[in-house]
From Swiss-Prot:
Mg(2+) 2 binds at residue 411. GO terms for cellular component: cytosol. It is an enzyme of class 6 (ligase). This is Lysine--tRNA ligase. One of its GO terms (molecular function) is magnesium ion binding. The keyword Acetylation does not apply. Belongs to the class-II aminoacyl-tRNA synthetase family. Homodimer. Its EC number is 6.1.1.6. Binds 3 Mg(2+) ions per subunit. Its main location: cytoplasm. Its cofactor is Mg(2+). It catalyses: tRNA(Lys) + L-lysine + ATP = L-lysyl-tRNA(Lys) + AMP + diphosphate.
Amino acid sequence: MFDNILEQQRIEKAKELKNLGINPYPHFLEKEMSLKTFKDKFSYILEQVEKRDESVNAVVAGRLKLLRIAGKSIFANIEDEDTNLQIYFNKDSVGEELYAILKKNLEVGDIVLVKGFPFVTKTGEFSLHASEVKLATKAIVPLPEKYHGLTDIEQRYRKRYVDMIMNAEVRKDFLVRSKVVSLIRHFFENKGFLEVETPMMHPIAGGANAKPFVTFHNSLGVERFLRIAPELYLKRLVVGGFEAVFEINRCFRNEGMDLTHNPEFTTIEFYWAYHNYKDLMDLTEELFALLLDKLNLGKTIEFDGKMIDFSKPFERITYKDALCKYGGLDRDLIEDKEKILTKLKVDGFEANEKLELGHLQAELFDNYVEEKLINPTFVIDFPISISPLSRRSDEDSQIAERFELFICGRELANGFNELNDPLDQYERFLKQIEAKNAGDEEACEMDEDFVNALGYGMPPTAGQGIGIDRLVMLLTNKKSIRDVILFPAMRPLKSELKEKE
């Protein structure tokens, strides 16, 4: 560890500082203000003749990103969470002895505390003239080169801390993510929703069709499943009397990784008694309008080279109409299992003959429709067979009162009128068990306690989930989900695999 020559040289400098009575890792150094505050507060000097205010004695801190020795003076650029600032000091300003120590031992990557006044250099750059410079933290590992930086995309994700040091834009993206979560939370609180927390480890893998992560509870001697979705617990709360609840938290799915999928991801799920899925679509449009406004994005944004118009109302189209309009498929084809199988095979897609009509229609949707839905589009009235927790339509028993929101070819939200008939729910679970026994690893399992909860009576309720990671991707124009997750899942390095062997 820390055994290359550059790291060893830095370690020796840290030792030398200790020998001089300077702790390279002091316990506490207090800064007075951020670099942004310093710039804003003292920008008035730009309008003065002298271009300086020596009556100021402000204390700031930051990481050294640039260090340049010019004769008997040192220019440096420090950076904090928000911005950067040039600092300047010389033998006269900090003292000859300290200057010599700093000149020899300060390096790019070190974190320093600086006290001084604002001034403008001869080249016109707003700067801080330092009277004190204290080492706050000695960096042992050198930063990547400024102009080449951390260019290996895999390394950026594996060493996010370095990525954040080198790329201010990365920090800005995660500030946007944090703001999005905060805005969503306050939006629902202002609507009268109650934020709750439900279990992350479930006795039954349920709430969505997905393959779970399995763990073991040593004390209880039983298997547990990391949460696929919080849905069934949140609906239990509606049964219990809370009429509007939401949860922002992690979900886990033991499936593949790609540009839009990470094994652990963040969602908001919310349930609203005495409302229907049309109310949810209206609420979702209102939420997007708020986010775009608060993030100063306007009603039209760019994502992956495409312009997306968020003007209300969003398009609403039935599942079957979308197959015809966007998929270019004939109405008689989408209602005929054999014709669907033939179409899929001819076009080179996998076609499982054991699937029922609703699942085959879903194959058509995935292959012919989804990528064409660019502007926000609510696709409504899904096949009941792929909607095991949704309420049946009163007009057509094969249709679920369900929608999904698609933007730029990706699903962003899923909502429906909740199934509150316990007998119907029990039968749906039995069909899911049949599907699982037939080889569908993602089929739901029976949850008799949930059915029992419905037996006590759940009021008419609508519920929805929104993937926050994909939402942030959209709002920051990022193609990969790993760009909006601080520490995304990564495949093990070969060296890590060898160590395990």
